[in-house]
């Protein structure tokens, strides 16, 4: 689901923790602060995330919980603006910054994320596919265990 930066700030404010790893969320006001808050709340009501100014819907719980899981994750990977948090339950939260300070948030199986990354960025695949390499490519669980056991955050991509 797509959210504006102000809507992401709202979700950040109602979940545990402070910062969202790798994403500098800030409530930037163009008009008065009060007008921006009302505009954000009305946008969330239109999307079905809020029932009223103080009541979160079941549909609103899912993105709030996804952001909370992203913040609680110990393992994050950033690949060319894709912000990925690896969760314990073989899932991943992917936050994609879009144009006009909007974000798309997805909850996917980790294997699906890895498959999509290899498909989108063929540079991550190296060499020819021999039988030995094919066996390594098929053993995704081993790769995921290595990433999970990694104590540090991983960043892959070109940075300027």
Place the predicted regions along the sequence by residue.
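Disordered, low-complexity tails and leader-like regions
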Residues: 24-33, 39-43, 110-118, 122-126, ...
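Accessory beta->alpha helical hairpin/"wing" motif in late/C-terminal subdomains of nucleic-acid enzymes
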Residues: 51-118
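Short, amphipathic alpha-helical interface elements at domain boundaries
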Residues: 1-45, 51-52
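Long, low-complexity, charge-rich intrinsically disordered regions
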Residues: 117-160
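A short-motif feature that recognizes glycine-rich, charge-decorated loops
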Residues: 29, 47, 58-61, 156-159
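Generic structural signal for short, solvent-exposed loop/turn connectors between secondary structure elements
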Residues: 1, 28-38, 51-56, 76-84, ...
């Amino acid at each position: 689901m797509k959210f504006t930066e102000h809507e992401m700030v709202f979700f950040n404010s109602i979940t545990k923790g402070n910062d969202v790893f790798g994403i500098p969320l800030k409530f930037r006001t163009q008009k008065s602060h009060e007008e921006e808050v009302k505009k954000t709340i009305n946008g969330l009501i239109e999307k079905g995330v809020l029932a009223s100014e103080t009541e979160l819907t079941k549909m609103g719980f899912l993105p709030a919980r996804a952001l909370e899981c992203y913040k609680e994750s110990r393992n994050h990977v950033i690949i060319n603006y894709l912000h990925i948090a690896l969760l314990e339950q073989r899932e991943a939260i992917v936050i994609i910054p879009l144009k006009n300070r909007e974000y798309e948030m997805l909850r996917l199986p980790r294997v699906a994320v890895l498959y999509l990354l290899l498909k989108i960025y063929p540079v991550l695949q190296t060499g020819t596919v021999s039988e030995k390499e094919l066996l390594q490519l098929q053993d995704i669980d081993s790769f995921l265990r290595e990433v999970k056991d990694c104590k540090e955050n991983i960043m892959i991509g070109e940075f300027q």
